[in-house]
């Protein structure tokens, strides 16, 4: 079996460690590759490479950096389908999703920041006839990106794009579950002309993350993952006063009012729960439906959910793919059993799919529970699988209070034809990413991130680029300096 390793100093890096692990295809359980586990010596090699790369990259003009990033965008788009197929093998998601979204939206973000890079500027202000000051936005240095396994290459692009556009170097650690496409991204960056060492990839488990958060030469850590892990990463980073961005978990509400377009609302609920087989941090897993349309909503939801195609992720007709691992599949199935035991009514799904040659994969049927109560564990806890909870509500004030009754605050959505109500409700919802009569779109221009336990900082948008810089203030004296000392 092929041995995959790290990408350091513009090339594949064999590394010093003899330890390795195997990554598997979630759809059939077959091994994909053996992966080298980085040790401290490998990490030091990545750090030294990043230092050298940073000196070259940060000295280039913003226009020069922009041109190189745009070359990478062109290569990514040219190889979209090839990269999508590898992403499917790594993640188990349907090929129709990977082709349309994963590489495309990541490339969009790189292109966006390539355009923004030349706009980074400081300010100048006169103080009096003898003094003025100016500011410079300077790169932080070496930044670390720690990725998740649901959108591996997209996350690598989302994290690297603003970091590189601002003149930083990055060391990226993909999830050990999905280590392959980050290596392809590194190769593409090099092919586009990125100086050696500016984007490095180190492979491994949580120990590599600990090396990154502990290393004094890392200036910033951007992490995507589960909230509990994020707190550990943030705590470790604080010991050396690293800047952090945390994109964490959620238990997001989708609110459907009585005047909503029913077809659209059902479509959104399905996207918000079954896209990428439910392995999306922004999933709207708590679907609140007004009592007057509840029965019609549930009836249409059942009919349409049962038509979804669960199957081979490489089949273009497949709509629901495989969960990332056997362990995660077991966790999702356990949550389903807990929901049944709690008294919720299983509307559809709720089982492992094994027919049509899927017995060796990690497939769970799209699942919907009705007659749910806010206190039930499956309503409160993030499941990260294709499991939807439908809840009934009567009044606007009531549903706002219930929607906010969670430790999370990542996303929220409202479906209504009443524009005043839409804005009024969204303004009261405690969530960082909100949609009105839509769900899931996340354009490069829009900053995304969570409230409460769902994160700190933002990905995408103008403000994220600024967070990969530090401000230097320079005061200039035009006249003789007057000392208070003789």
UniProtKB/Swiss-Prot annotation:
Instruction: List residues binding K(+) 1.
Output: 23, 90
List residues binding K(+) 2: 241, 452, 455
Where on the chain is Cysteine sulfenic acid (-SOH) found, per UniProt?
281
Q: Name one GO biological process term.
A: glycine betaine biosynthetic process from choline
Q: Which CDD domains match?
A: ALDH_F9_TMBADH
The UniProt keywords, alphabetically, are: Metal-binding, NAD, NADP, Oxidation, Oxidoreductase, Potassium
Enzyme nomenclature, EC number: 1.2.1.8
Segments traversing the membrane: none
InterPro entries recorded: Ald_DH/histidinol_DH (IPR016161), Ald_DH_C (IPR016163), Ald_DH_CS_CYS (IPR016160), Ald_DH_CS_GLU (IPR029510), Ald_DH_N (IPR016162), Aldehyde_DH_dom (IPR015590), BADH (IPR011264)
One GO MF term on file is: metal ion binding
Tell me which residues bind NAD(+): 147-149, 173-176, 226-229, 249, 281, 382
The EC category is oxidoreductase
Function, please?
Involved in the biosynthesis of the osmoprotectant glycine betaine. Catalyzes the irreversible oxidation of betaine aldehyde to the corresponding acid.
Q: Which family does it belong to?
A: Belongs to the aldehyde dehydrogenase family.
- Please report the name of this protein according to its UniProt entry: Betaine aldehyde dehydrogenase
